[in-house]
From Swiss-Prot:
Keywords: Glycosyltransferase, Golgi apparatus, Membrane, Signal-anchor, Transferase, Transmembrane, Transmembrane helix. This is Hydroxyproline O-arabinosyltransferase 1. Disruption phenotype: No visible phenotype. Short-root-hair phenotype. Hpat1 hpat2 double mutants have longer hypocotyls, are early flowering and show early senescence in leaves associated with a decrease in chlorophyll content. Hpat1 hpat3 double mutants have an impaired growth of pollen tubes, thereby causing a transmisson defect through the male gametophyte. Hpat1 hpat2 hpat3 triple mutants fail to produce detectable levels of Hyp-arabinosides, have low fertility and shorter pollen tubes. GO terms for molecular function: hydroxyproline O-arabinosyltransferase activity. It is a single-pass type II membrane protein.
Length: 366
């Protein structure tokens, strides 16, 4: 290969960054008019008509306080693994929304299904069908479909609410969520493993020094985030392009690994001048967080392993365990065994909530 091989990757990265810069300029001046490269028309993209009608962009309650509604959106594939989580998530969304009363700021709900075709749960969960990335473009990193799915949904759907909550299938809402965004700022959960300062050298390819200090990049992913709809319409195309460029960049891909798409969102939000209020009380992540407390969401991303005395055995399969990954090819059964005495309240609550959902969702396990 010689010199040509040596220059190929730097040249590819340079071109990718140039494309990102171009898209930032375009999206800042003409939000969401661009489509995915290579697609001649948005008419090729199927839209599922079964979408819950939102309750409106905003209103006032009896006290005269303005209700700033947000629409909850969850991206998912059509895998068994994603599907059972979405069914549980939507069950609790409906129940918590109903319990909140007329002053709730929780508006409509959409599952953004990036499989490219409808599935059997279209009537159960309000769903928009998005096209996946062209074959091979995700390079085995299926999460890259998330920003592209959001671009399609924002472009093709009449969303009545003025704000969007980006959530995930493995989120369970435990109490009514208010609109935490304000004054042009988004609201987001800070992740300890998103460290812009540590990776400044890599991030400067995508967030140049002229844009300001690297600390302008918040330590967040795209979820959970509440952000203005108009702001997200600008951020989403940039998020898509930065994600794809980072995945093609060996240095960025190695540095960020499985959280690459999270860094891409944080960078894109900063590029468009959208800072975020960091809310540690947005969610908990059992088993590390032991109490639900005043948090809004349980995120069950980690496995929960305990011995029969209630002692955590993380890193070792426990005598009692709950790990969503145990149910990648079939849904968890109804009436999961409750954890033994001594297990943290957060884990007990998680299992109780999953059991309630599966007991009440029709045709569970079908």
């Amino acid at each position: 290969m010689g010199c040509g091989g040596t220059l190929f990757y730097p040249l590819l990265i340079t071109l990718s960054v140039a494309l990102i810069t171009y898209n930032i300029i375009i999206s800042a001046n003409a939000p969401l008019k661009q489509g995915f490269p290579g697609r001649s028309s948005s008419s090729d993209i199927s839209i599922d008509p079964v979408i819950e009608l939102p309750r409106g962009g905003g209103s006032r309650n009896n006290d005269g306080k303005r209700i700033r509604l947000f629409h909850t959106a969850v991206t998912a594939s059509d895998s068994v693994y994603n599907t059972w989580q979405c069914r549980v998530m939507y069950y609790w969304f409906k129940k918590i929304q109903a319990s909140a009363g007329p002053g709730s700021e929780m508006g409509g709900f959409t599952r953004i299904l990036h499989s490219g075709k409808p599935d059997q749960y279209m009537d159960e969960i309000p769903t928009f069908v998005a096209q996946p990335l062209p074959s091979g473009m995700d390079q085995g990193y299926v999460v890259l479909n998330r920003p592209w799915a959001f671009v399609q949904w924002l472009q093709q759907t009449d969303i009545k609410e003025d704000y969007i909550l980006m959530s995930e299938p493995d989120h369970i809402i435990v109490k009514p969520i208010p609109n935490l965004a304000k004054d042009g700022l988004g609201a987001a959960f800070p992740f300890f493993y998103i460290e812009p300062k540590k990776y400044e050298k890599v991030l400067r390819k995508y967030y140049p020094e002229v844009r300001g200090p690297v600390t302008n990049i918040d330590p967040i992913g795209n979820s959970p985030v509440i952000v203005g709809k108009d702001a997200l319409k600008k951020i989403a195309p940039t998020w898509m392009n930065v994600s794809l460029a980072m995945k093609k960049d060996p240095e960025a891909d190695k540095a960020f690994g499985w959280v690459l798409e999270m860094y891409a969102y944080a960078v894109s939000s900063a590029l468009h001048g959208v800072s975020n209020i960091l809310h540690k009380d947005f969610m908990i992540q059992p088993p590390w967080d032991i109490e639900v407390g005043d948090k809004y969401i349980i995120h069950y991303t980690y496995g929960c392993d305990y011995d029969m005395k209630g002692k955590l055995t993380y890193g070792k399969i426990g005598e009692w365990r709950f790990d969503k990954r145990s149910y990648d090819s079939k849904p968890p059964p109804r009436n999961l065994t409750m954890p033994p005495p001594g297990v943290s309240q957060s884990v007990v609550t998680l299992v109780k909530m999953i059991n309630e959902a599966t007991a009440n969702i029709p045709n569970w396990g079908s």
